[in-house]
């Protein structure tokens, strides 16, 4: 079975669009782009367009690749103080000379719709309400719920320990709640006995950032696999590349119980959760 993200995302977005249509003023989403990374340009354009399509007011704030930390913090401060802005995200990756932690911490936690501020991360880890969950982990759980993949008591192997996906996702899956409450193993590319552990997992979430890392020999026939990875691999097609995930899809798809494709799996869910967080932020400010 293919766990396609597009129909799930469309359902989430349609609900948000209907709710926005009844609001007195539009939610505002500010997207900060530093530099001119081609992939980042595409992602920013996609997020701004999606927000606009839903009835939000969204704008990309572009700064050059040699922008200083002071320049960026001044922009973020202005956006923090702008009452028409309800969500702020800084597109990553950032140029290497910049301190990403300082930039993320400068965003008001109440407007941190990417869910990466230490305050929101802390609330997530403690199971406290009122914060924003990171978009990709939230999207993964929404995807699993849509396809009625049970999590309660199941062994979930998360491969990847990033602050954006692996760590927060593990924390969310472990929450003592009927919709999650999974048994989680957090792995990475250097974990010992990786293959043996993965073969015991009911659900594998691949977020290691290495193309085709998860092979057919590493998964069982009962495994449900969520592929978070997105990498460009050079080819001779018109684009000059194809997008592949962290899972060797062509060989794994015929063995596992279910798998999310790349593209069209987790990607649409990440954008949908960003819009959901922005709408929820607007509602909090409005109340």
UniProtKB/Swiss-Prot annotation:
EC number(s) reported in the record: 1.5.1.5, 3.5.4.9
Domain of life: Bacteria
CC per GO annotation: cytosol
Gene Ontology process terms (BP): L-histidine biosynthetic process; methionine biosynthetic process; purine nucleotide biosynthetic process; tetrahydrofolate interconversion
CDD domains: NAD_bind_m-THF_DH_Cyclohyd (cd01080)
UniProt GO molecular function: methenyltetrahydrofolate cyclohydrolase activity; methylenetetrahydrofolate dehydrogenase (NADP+) activity
Any Pfam family matching the protein: THF_DHG_CYH_C
Transmembrane regions: none
Pathway involvement of the protein, from the record: One-carbon metabolism; tetrahydrofolate interconversion
Binding residues annotated for NADP(+), in chain numbering: 160-162, 189, 230
Keywords: Amino-acid biosynthesis, Histidine biosynthesis, Hydrolase, Methionine biosynthesis, Multifunctional enzyme, NADP, One-carbon metabolism, Oxidoreductase, Purine biosynthesis
Entry-linked InterPro entries: Aminoacid_DH-like_N_sf, NAD(P)-bd_dom_sf, THF_DH/CycHdrlase, THF_DH/CycHdrlase_cat_dom, THF_DH/CycHdrlase_CS, THF_DH/CycHdrlase_NAD-bd_dom
Catalytic activity as recorded in UniProt: (6R)-5,10-methylene-5,6,7,8-tetrahydrofolate + NADP(+) = (6R)-5,10-methenyltetrahydrofolate + NADPH; (6R)-5,10-methenyltetrahydrofolate + H2O = (6R)-10-formyltetrahydrofolate + H(+)
NCBIfam families linked: PRK14181.1 (NF010778)
Quaternary organization: Homodimer.
Family under the similarity heading: Belongs to the tetrahydrofolate dehydrogenase/cyclohydrolase family.
Function: Catalyzes the oxidation of 5,10-methylenetetrahydrofolate to 5,10-methenyltetrahydrofolate and then the hydrolysis of 5,10-methenyltetrahydrofolate to 10-formyltetrahydrofolate.
Descriptive protein name: Bifunctional protein FolD
């Amino acid at each position: 079975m293919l766990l396609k993200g597009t129909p799930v995302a469309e359902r989430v977005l349609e609900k948000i669009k209907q709710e926005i249509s009844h609001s007195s003023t539009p939610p505002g989403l500010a997207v900060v782009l530093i530099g001119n990374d081609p992939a980042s340009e595409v992602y920013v354009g996609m997020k701004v367009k999606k927000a606009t399509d839903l009835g939000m007011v969204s704008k990309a704030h572009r700064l050059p690749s040699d922008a200083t930390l002071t320049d960026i913090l001044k922009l973020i401060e202005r956006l923090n103080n702008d009452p028409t802005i309800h969500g702020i995200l800084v597109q990553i990756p950032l140029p290497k000379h910049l301190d990403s932690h300082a930039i993320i911490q400068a965003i008001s936690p109440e407007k941190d719709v990417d869910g990466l501020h230490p305050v929101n991360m802390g609330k997530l880890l403690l199971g406290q309400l009122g914060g924003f969950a990171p978009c990709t982990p939230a999207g993964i759980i929404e995807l699993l719920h849509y396809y009625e993949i049970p999590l309660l008591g199941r062994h979930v192997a998360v491969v990847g320990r990033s602050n954006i996906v692996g760590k927060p996702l593990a924390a969310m899956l472990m929450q003592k709640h009927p919709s999650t409450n999974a048994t989680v193993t957090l792995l990475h590319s250097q974990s010992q006995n990786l293959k043996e552990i993965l073969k015991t997992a009911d659900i594998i979430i691949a977020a290691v950032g290495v193309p085709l890392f998860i092979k057919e020999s590493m998964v069982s026939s009962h495994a449900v696999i969520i592929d978070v990875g997105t990498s460009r691999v050079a080819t001779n097609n018109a684009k000059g590349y194809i997008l592949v995930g962290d899972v060797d899809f062509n060989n794994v798809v015929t063995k596992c119980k279910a798998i999310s494709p790349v593209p069209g799996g987790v990607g649409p869910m990440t954008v949908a959760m960003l819009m959901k967080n922005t709408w929820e932020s607007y509602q909090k400010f409005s109340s």
